[in-house]
């Protein structure tokens, strides 16, 4: 059984001293945090640091010579637990395969990163971009050209992230 002290039975002087001490304690805590550096960021104007392992917007990469990396092995499509990736491939004259259609439904994607880990040529990656809000759901259906465009925009950042995290893949 928990006993509560009944402060109403204390003398007025004791209550006054107790209240003053509690006020001083509260002011001490307030003053202690007042002079510490702020932890709140003013988001649209200030952005916090991102981990190099952050999983954001998807991108398809190209080689330095301009040829797309994707070899249409469809491992990313097979491993995707949300079944958000759709690939159609076509064989080239030289016998290699390339994608004709590469779609990702970003409304289904759970950003697990399995597609990135399964890809043998680092073609599909999740980049550092997290600001891709849209007004309609249709804009979140990424096709091959949108994914290649993302790869062009974020190539330097993606390359740096892959180099830093190569030991984990």
Curated annotation (Swiss-Prot):
The UniProt catalytic activity note for this protein reads: a quinone + NADH + 5 H(+)(in) = a quinol + NAD(+) + 4 H(+)(out)
Organism, per UniProt? Ehrlichia chaffeensis (strain ATCC CRL-10679 / Arkansas)
Known cofactor(s): [4Fe-4S] cluster
Enzyme group, top EC level?
A: translocase
Q: Where is this chain's protein located in or outside the cell?
A: Cell inner membrane
Q: Which residues bind [4Fe-4S] cluster 1?
A: 70, 73, 76, 119
Among the GO biological process terms of this entry, one is: aerobic respiration
Q: Which GO terms describe its cellular component?
A: plasma membrane
- Name of the protein in question: NADH-quinone oxidoreductase subunit I
């Amino acid at each position: 059984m928990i006993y509560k002290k009944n402060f109403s039975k204390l003398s007025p002087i004791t209550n006054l001293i107790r209240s003053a001490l509690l006020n001083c304690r509260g002011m001490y805590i307030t003053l202690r945090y007042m002079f510490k550096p702020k932890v709140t960021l003013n988001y649209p104007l200030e952005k916090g640091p991102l981990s190099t392992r952050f999983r954001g917007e998807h991108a398809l990469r190209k080689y330095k010579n301009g040829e797309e990396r994707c070899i249409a092995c469809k491992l990313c499509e097979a491993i995707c637990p949300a079944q958000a990736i759709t690939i159609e491939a076509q064989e080239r004259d030289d016998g290699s395969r390339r994608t004709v259609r590469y779609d990702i439904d970003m409304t289904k994607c759970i950003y697990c990163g399995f597609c990135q880990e399964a890809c043998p040529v680092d073609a599909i990656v999740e980049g550092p971009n997290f600001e891709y809000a849209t007004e309609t759901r249709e804009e979140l259906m990424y096709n091959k050209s949108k994914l290649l465009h993302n790869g062009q925009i974020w190539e330097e950042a993606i390359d740096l992230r892959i180099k830093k995290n190569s030991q984990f893949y």
